[in-house]
Amino acid sequence: TRTEAGLDFVSLVEKSPVLLVFLRHAGCTFCRESLSDIARNRAEIERTGTRIVLVHMGDRKEMRQLIERYGLSSVDRICDLDRRLYAAFGLKNGKLWQLFGPKAWWRVLVAGFLRGHGVWFPTESMRQMPGVFFIQQGELAKSFRHRSIADRPSYMQLVQTGPNN
């Protein structure tokens, strides 16, 4: 698997720690919120020597524009249209309650309307669940698997050394 810039993913994880962030579709409120959170924490994450890699399943141009809007244009990206990498990391399609449960509705109001991330129509598979993985020395060190699309991981907590959460 290669990044959109042509870098080999295996080489990346062997060279430095990687925070691998699997996004949902570009229309997802929580995808936008995740990009905002990553942008806000980026300098601190990178100070740990960690490289951020975003994985998406959407149109390259549309995702590039969205990622640029959050000031993350220089972050490595992997376009995984067939969602093989999602599957390799155990990220599945969400169940109805994970996608449309009370937590998701409440957080859409907060993140989408109050915090300005918007509410948009799905552009790709709306059932795909997101996830975040911290890879260190080529090994999976920590992971955050969303139980709901509305879950909000602490990216800094993931890149700090210590046992898996």
Regions found by a protein language model. Give the residues of each.
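Short, acidic, Ser/Thr-enriched surface-loop or helix-capping motifs
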Residues: T1-T3, I135-Q136
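A short, well-ordered alpha-helical element
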Residues: T3-F9
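A structure-centric signal for secondary-structure junctions around beta-strands
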Residues: G6, K15-S16, G49, S74, ...
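Short active-site neighborhood of thiol/selenol oxidoreductases, capturing the structured segment around
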Residues: F9-A39, R51
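Short beta-strand/turn micro-motifs composed of small residues
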Residues: L23, H56, Q136
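Structural microenvironment flanking redox-active thiols in thiol-disulfide oxidoreductases
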Residues: S34-A88
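Thiol/selenol-based redox catalytic cores and closely related redox-interacting motifs
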Residues: I67, S73-D76, D80-A150
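A short, polar/charged loop-to-alpha-helix boundary motif
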Residues: A150-N164
